[in-house]
């Protein structure tokens, strides 16, 4: 399964892309396969937000969350769902659900478990949320 996830990642992610990985990059070292073993096989610049299983690998990520504007929306990126912010991208819940809404609040699960084991991009997220298409700002690299 590891090789299939790597194949699907590289099918979608170009070397120059930036990917926000929302934690649990790899559960623990097994048979000499650690964070660096997997990382060097993946395209893109990976910004890793710490997950609850990242203590078991060598990622050394110190980032607990990221706030970023994508598609004109201020997103909060964190491993666990955060229901105190308006727009949250998370992982952690595996295949329990993909989108949770509470009034104007949205929690979107970007985990591979609910995305056919592919990384998901902002265009797919916006489409899933039935919002207008995301038009990137030409002054950014997003």
Language model regions located:
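Core catalytic region of metal-dependent phosphoesterases/phosphodiesterases
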Residues: 1-67
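Conserved beta-sheet core of the metallophosphoesterase superfamily
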Residues: 58-140
